[in-house]
Every structure is written in structure tokens, then in C-alpha cells.
């Protein structure tokens, strides 16, 4: 009998960071992403990029193994620390639900 695996949860977080806070924000984001990927088996991928012409516009492609893993991620100490420390830095946040067309990662 083949077990069905839940579909991954994929979303794009669109953030606008206060321009004068960008230098302080980036290491906090990096710390949160590193901890999430290293410590949470259900966090399959977190990739952050900045728009070239507007570096205060950050986009994060998030991939979680399941909805349960996403919800667990939101309760982790490292995510709660990130949210607390960056709350005054984030000018706007929009979570966009997306459907994966093709997700591939080259390891190594």
C-alpha cells in the first residue's frame, strides 16, 4: 500500500523593510532562515532575495513539507525571536499563496 504524502505548502512572502533598518534587518533574517532550515525537518526551503532596484523590497520563497509543518514553524523560538526583533522594521508584509510548477534544488 502506497502512503499519500501531503502536498508541500509553497508561498511567497513579500516584505517591505524600512530603508534605514535594512542593515539591521538582514542579519536577523539570515539567522532565522539558517535556524529554520537546520533545525526543522518540515522546512524544505527558505530563499530570500531583494529587488535589485529597491533593496528594501525582500521576497522569500518558502516551502514546507505540510501545513502542519508550516504551523509548527510559526511557533518555534527562532521564528518568534525574528518576529519580535523585526516588528518595527517591517513596513509591509504580504503572504502570497502560490502553486509550485517545478521545484528543484542542487545539493552540494
Region locations from a protein language model:
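An amphipathic, aromatic/His-enriched active-site/gating alpha helix that lines ligand/cofactor pockets
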Residues: 4, 31-44, 63-96
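N-terminal first-folded block
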Residues: 5-39, 44, 48
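Short, well-ordered beta-strand segments in beta-rich or mixed alpha/beta enzyme
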Residues: 8-16, 45-74
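Short phosphate-engaging motifs
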Residues: 21, 56, 78
Amino acid at each position: 500500500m502506497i502512503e499519500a504524502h501531503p502536498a508541500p505548502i509553497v508561498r511567497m512572502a513579500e516584505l517591505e523593510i524600512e530603508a534605514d533598518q535594512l542593515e539591521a534587518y538582514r542579519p536577523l533574517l539570515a539567522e532565522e532562515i539558517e535556524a529554520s532550515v537546520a533545525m526543522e525537518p518540515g522546512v524544505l526551503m527558505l530563499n530570500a532575495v531583494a529587488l535589485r532596484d529597491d533593496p528594501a523590497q525582500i521576497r522569500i520563497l518558502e516551502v514546507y513539507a505540510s501545513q502542519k509543518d508550516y504551523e509548527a514553524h510559526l511557533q518555534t523560538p527562532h521564528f518568534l525571536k525574528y518576529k519580535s526583533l523585526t516588528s518595527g522594521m517591517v513596513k509591509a508584509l504580504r503572504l502570497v499563496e502560490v502553486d509550485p510548477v517545478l521545484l528543484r534544488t542542487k545539493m552540494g
